[in-house]
Amino acid sequence: MLFNSFIFLFAFLPVALLTHWLVERFRPEWRLPLLVLLSFVFYGYWDWRFVPLLLASVLVNWLIAQAFLASKCSGLVTVAIVVNLAVLAVFKYFNFFADFANLIPGLHAPKFDIALPLGISFFTFHHIMYLTDLRAGKAPRYGLVRYALYIAFFPQVLAGPLVRWSEIMHQLDERPYQRHDAAERFARGLMLLVAGLAKKVFIGDQLAEYVNPIFQAADAGKAVTMIEAWQATLGFTFQIYFDFSGYTDMALGLALLFGIVLPQNFDVPYRSVSLQDFWRRWHMTLSRFLRDYLYIALGGNRRGLALQLVALFTTMALGGLWHGAGLTFVVWGAAHGLGLCAGVLWRKAGLSMPNLVGWVLTFIFVMLTWVLFRATTFEGALRIYEGLFGFGGFGAGFKWRAIAAAAAVAMIGPTAWAFVHKLPARRWIAVAFAVLFVIVLFKIGDDANYEFIYFQF
């Protein structure tokens, strides 16, 4: 059930909103159980076989949290984190490591054809955040229903944002439709939903048509011309931004419809003037998780420059692996780790750089490394890189209009959250968004309905 599908927009969402409004008004004590039920129904629509996994994940981690609070045995939390990561590894990385093992002569590690449960990378990290903070004495005890909603809340369960317990739990005590600004918040939630849909459908999916065939050809071993390579590389640079930020806008808008404010995930990342600045603006909740729960745990910047660089490189390489079970993702993360390490050394040396130069270098670096992220093989990435430098011929037919329009919106415009929340309460604005929604629906009906890129992670 994609956020940009008719069954979600015209069946699940209206029923969910109506029942939520009725319960919030007449039986507020049922509100949280209802949201949990809706979240599991939403998750089960994708593949009901993984509902028991999500249920077990919630129940086991909650029971371990209760056991820790009763015994104060920190080893329980350590075991829980290891088990969570082990479950993630079995589903996501088993065949990846089996391929490595089979490189050893005489060893024949088995491989299994198992589907990846949607959202497992995200709800695993949610468990880790809560349990780690619980052990540190920062997180309080929560009941099973509240904890289940924190983990499985349907706008965030599939692809984030990664939400800290401290950002959402206190909101569950509110009666959102009784607030003085309830109507305004609901309206802005609808506008965010429409804005995210428009970004995904009009820009992200449009660019996918120019990007996917070229990367598929490269992965198949075909030569790529310079025009094709630049079109695919630039196109994917903006496709992934509008696809993922569009999803995030929709998730934030949907959550707002149910009275919950989720953290923002993007802050105009392609205006960054350094790689460090980029990771403060791109997938901000993941960057925050990697910093607080991995980089600092590895020593951070507290144990000297050498260990800081090792911790930074390791964090980014593992961050790349988190995105996918493939060496291309690891190398993508490692490349960003090396880039961030270079930035640390640059600043330690007391050097500076004009913002314009920093922006150009950062954009080029990010753009070139996206090739590794998008290509499914190193051979495919190499074909794209060869094409970028003209080894596959020049070519023709560069789709510059769509890419230029996407670049302008990505670099000049504000975030959808900032834009929507700055709009005055005017009837014509509501009408404009309603018209935009109708146009989006026609577009969805006419064209291919692409899944969100980050659903595969």
Predicted regions and their residues:
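Membrane-embedded transmembrane alpha-helical bundles that form the catalytic cores
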Residues: 1-406, 418-456
